[in-house]
Amino acid sequence: MDRLVRFTFRHFLANPWFTKLLSTENVENARFLKLLPDIPALHSPLVGQIRTILERGHAAGVFRRDVDPIQLYISIAALGYFYVSNMATLSVIFEKDLSSVSMVQEREAQAVQMVIDYLKTKPA
């Protein structure tokens, strides 16, 4: 799970154009995405891998059982997407350079920890 969160975070960081593309496509109500064939099939293997990781973690007594792999993927993606897509404005608001190596590393570590802590937390 650590590697998945880091990979996703780093993907958004290394490809800032992707956040712009997603933002534009959402403004357009996924107009162009709807024209592409088999889009759901592209994410099925990823969701399956997440499901497998969750099952293994539960079997090992490490992860809680009630986590939906799609919801988890959305949360993981959100942690990277929001940071990258709002880096400029948040840097001004908080008077910190969120693009600096130290800030990026801190945010990535926090994203990983947030996901791991969520997966270990017993449901209410």
Regions from the PLM with identified roles:
Residues 1-7, 18-20:
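Active-site-adjacent scaffolding segments
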Residues 1-4, 34-40, 55:
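Amphipathic alpha-helical linker/stalk segments
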Residues 6, 24-27, 68, 77:
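Short amphipathic alpha-helical surface patches that mediate protein-protein
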Residues 7-10, 14, 44-60, 75-124:
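C-terminal peripheral helix-coil segments that are non-catalytic and often amphipathic
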Residues 14-37, 87-94:
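Amphipathic alpha-helical segments used for helix-helix packing
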Residues 16, 20, 70-77:
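Non-catalytic, well-ordered alpha-helical scaffold segments
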Residues 35-42, 59-75:
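All-alpha amphipathic helical-bundle segments outside canonical DNA-binding/catalytic cores
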